[in-house]
Every structure is written in structure tokens, then in C-alpha cells.
Regions:
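Conserved, structured core segments of small domains
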Residues: 1-103
Length: 103
């Protein structure tokens, strides 16, 4: 299943060292999620502390487990939307498939 996840980071004030440690752990965890094929894309919302991610997970429980593993989870306001394939995507996939088959 694919999900659009909006994550608003509300990390409190803390020492620079502690903030750097948490941010480093967050980057490392995100890289692991990318390597596992769970985190597909991650974008910023300009002018905010919000990120929007495209995640793939087997089900909502797996996604919850992934998100709750984020080092900043306790400070995030998260909204999740399940995604369905748009008919245009199906047409594009079919067109690519037929082009590859004839090449």
C-alpha cells in the first residue's frame, strides 16, 4: 500500500548537541527506510518545518510501526492518507509495457 504522510516537526528547544544527535539518528533511520523500499520520496514544504513523504508499507499497522520508530516521533504531528492508483498511472504503465515488449 502507498501512503502520503505529512510530518510537522515540533521538536522542543534543547542543547545543540542533543538536537544534532537526534537529527543524525533521524537521517540514519530515513536512509534505512529508503534502503528497505519503504520511504520512496521525501519533500519539504517551503517556509515550514513540515515534510511530506511517500511511503510504501504492507498495511497501516506496518506504516504505524515505521513512523513510531522515528527518533522525532514524539514531537511530530503526523497525518496519513492512503493512496490509490489513478487511471492515468495504469495507462502509463500499460504504454511503457507495450513499448518495452516491441523493442
Amino acid at each position: 500500500m502507498e501512503f502520503l504522510v505529512r510530518q510537522e516537526n515540533n521538536m522542543p528547544q534543547m542543547s545543540a548537541e542533543e538536537a544534532a544527535r537526534i537529527k543524525s539518528a533521524e537521517r540514519e533511520y530515513a536512509q534505512q527506510l529508503r534502503e528497505r523500499g519503504i520511504l520512496r520520496r521525501l519533500c519539504r514544504v517551503p517556509g515550514t518545518r513540515t515534510a511530506v513523504g511517500w511511503y510504501e508499507a504492507g498495511d497501516v499497522t506496518e506504516l504505524h510501526d515505521v513512523l513510531s520508530g522515528l527518533p522525532t516521533f514524539q514531537w511530530q504531528a503526523i497525518t496519513v492518507e492512503a493512496l490509490a492508483t489513478h487511471p492515468q498511472e495504469k495507462l502509463l504503465a500499460a504504454a511503457k509495457s507495450s513499448t518495452t515488449a516491441t523493442a
